[in-house]
Structure formats: structure tokens, C-alpha cells
Amino acid sequence: MGKTTGFMDYTRKTSTDVPPLERMENFDEFHIWLSREEQQTQAARCMDCGVPFCQAGMMIGGMASGCPLNNLIPEWNDLVYHGKWELALHRLLATNRFPEFTSRVCPALCEAACTCGDVTGSSVTVRENEHAIIETGYAKGWLHAAPPPARTGKSVAVVGSGPSGLSVAEYLNKRGHAVTVFERADRVGGLLMYGIPNMKLDKSVIERRIKLMQAEGVEFRTNMDVGGILAAEELLSSYDAVVLCCGAKQARDLNVPGRDANGVHFAVDYLTSVTRSLLDSKFADGRAINAAGRNVLVIGGGDTGNDCQGTALRQGCTDLVALEMMPQPPKERAASNPWPEWPRVLKVDYGQTECLAKFNKDPRIYQTTVKEFLKDDAGNLTGAVISYLKPERDPETGRTRMVPTGEEFTYDCQLAFIAAGFTGCESYVADAFGVDRTPRGNVADQNFKTNVDKVFVCGDMRRGQSVVVWGLREGRDCAAAVDRYLMGYTNL
């Protein structure tokens, strides 16, 4: 595939970024993408390896290795190298209906499993090749509405319009079923719209795709709180199948003194308020939680915590500290973490890069957690007592846990964002439909079907907190299960 000697002839080259201090002046996407000619050269580095782990999507050590969508990566790399962009688009869309999302926000599991990366030390630029393919497709007019040629007469209600909801709706509509998507928020997109900041995924990209889906026959109904203002019974009586795609939105809280202080927020609530205010009024309405002129504490070191860092910096925070409970990862792979496993190494994301540029420091403090939030007489947050932690083996379970060392310090802050992950789906939708739950708080299923007749579940609501690409895979697989239920067979 590609040029036989490409991985030896060419070095890896990726997009550049707008300088940190400059890009923090706005909420725009900041990648400066390669030209199509440069991207063709990068595609030539795909090395015709015997076993393309990049597309395997295997679980190794509890983590994914390679693309969960099983994208045909060597195929479309070869087509890009030869300048056959439209054919590359068709091969990409064969497995991934939303590459404009994954090429922006996916952690690139494919690149971590790239054989070229293992052999040469620098993987093929798979994610950026994917971005070039889909954006070339839009620019050339190759993506246009293609409604199904015939309808099956079956109807499906999809509850939730995040990655899995959009994915299951896309595939079921293409199959010919009448699909209606119900979204609780005022805009379609779920996690994509409000859980990911605009500079990471411009909302016009989502809206462009939604318009295409609408033109193909998918109906979207916003401000529809299923299980709240809209009874579950109404959907069950009106549709041939119902798919629950409500995510894992039950945020993990901190049960510490002072948690009720004004200024302590869940991270997703913060990010949602900022994006909504940006879209509604370009911040003129003053409804966004605002970090301007304030010291900010972020609790949690994942993608959401990083997004909080980047958002607070753009708003003009005066200082920033991010707490991470676990020890700092190594800079290089440990012997116990061999390729093609996902590399458990130190990552520097855009939020940390921007903090370094503005405050000359990495905001992260490892092996720490909040012991207590401090507040004044009016109940406003004034600071937090931070405890240092150390790993300790639990004698009963044998697992390692983090316990306080006894060493503490106080950080003066006026805002704190809890980005400690999620514990499962919100209970009221599951309760409204009467579906069973697992001990981990997810909806229980057998091949995406719940214990309730004609009710299915997919995405984070089924598998727990995950990433966008897994939501898309869940939606694709669930659509096949729903189609089989409705038709007695499936060709999805």
C-alpha cells in the first residue's frame, strides 16, 4: 500500500498550530492543516505492513489497540497517495460515517498501533489524512443528500443526539427506517455540541452534518426531555423501536467539606455554559461561567479537565492549577506496556501547552486531591486544601489505591471545576423505561437489547464513559441489532 519505500523516504509531518498566546484570544479551531499535496506525501509512508494493527480495534490489557471502527486505513492511505481522493472518501465512509468528528477529537488509537510507528518511531499521520479526505469531500461537493430509495414502513425513536445517537440514526435511516431523534438540549449534538469546546470541534462542523442528515430524512426534535416532559410510554406506543443513547452523564462528585461553595462546578456544566453563551450571543448574554480575573482549580486530568484548562485560559484566568490523583506517567513506554498496546506515557495536550505559554508552568500537580473547599461568610469559594497522595496496595483486593500522605497545602482560588469522570447514566431516563441497570450504573443489555421489549441501548449509556469513536462504533452495531429486530434480518 502507498509507496513501498515511503516510510524511509519521507519523515512524519503534521499540521502546525496557531501560537498559544495568539489562539487564546478566541475560541476558534487553531490547527493549520497541511496542503493536499503534503498530505499525499504523508499517506505514502503507509508501509504495506503484513498485519495492519491500525485498523484492528482489539482490546489489549483493557484498552483499545487500533481503530474501534475498523477503518480501512491502508486502503485509503494508498488512494490518497495516488491522488484518488473521491475513492478514498468512499472507502473511509464505508466504516465511518462521521470522519469530520473523529479527525478532530479522536485520540488516534490507530496511530498508537501503527506498525510504521513501531519500526521508525513515527507513525503515519492517519488522523490528519482522514481529516484531509473528509474536508476535500465537502469542498468538492462529493457529500450530498442521498435519501434511501425506499422506506421500510418501520419507525424508530432515538433518545439522545450524541455520537452514538447520531450514528444509530444515520445507519437506520440509510436502511430505510423512519428515524426521529429526541434531544433534551436546545441544539443537536449532545457531547459533541456542549461537552467539547469550540476550539477543539467547531460547532459549524456538527451543524453541517446535521443538515445533511435532515436532508436525507432524519427528523430532529430538540428541547424534548424524554422521561421528563415527554413520557416514555408515548414513544413506546408511537414507534416500532426505541434506542436509548443518553450517555454516561452522572458526574463523579467530591464528597468533601465545602463542596456547596459558590464557584464549585462540574466540568461539563462549565463547558456547556461557555459554548451555549458563545453560540447564543458571542458571550454578550453574560450567562457563561466566567474565569476572567480568577484563580482556577481543575480536579481531574483527562480530556475534560484539559478542555477546562483551555477554556479558562481563553476567558482570562489569573492562575491555573490542575490536580491529578495518579502518579505522573513515564515519558517513554515501560517494558510492561509494549506496542501495540495503547502507550501509557506522559501526554502534553493543548491546555498544558497554553498554560506553559501564559504562566510558564505545567498546571498539573500529580498525586493530589481536594481535602476541603474553603469559603467566605457569603458562601463563595476562596480556596481549597489539597492533600498529597501515595499508592498503597489494598490487602483485601490486592489493588493499588491512592491514600493521603498527611502532607497538605492550600491553594487560593475562586473557581473549581470537577472533572473526575462519570459514574454511569442519569437514572431518570432508564427508570422511565423500566430498563435494568448493571452494578456499574450502565443500562444492562443483550446484544444492545434491554429487558424491555423493543427498547435498545448503545453508547456510553451501555458501555460507560468512553470516547467519541467508541460511540460511533456502538451506534453502528446497535443499528444492525435494531434492523434485525424490525426486519428479521439485517444488511447493515
Segments and roles (model prediction):
Residues 8-32, 41-44, 70-80, 91-92, ...:
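Beta1-alpha1 glycine-rich phosphate/pyrophosphate-binding loop at the start
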Residues 305-310, 461-489:
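A conserved FAD-binding loop/helix module that cradles the flavin
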Residues 40, 44, 48-56, 62-149, ...:
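Glycine/serine-rich phosphate-binding loop and adjoining beta1-alpha1 elements at the start
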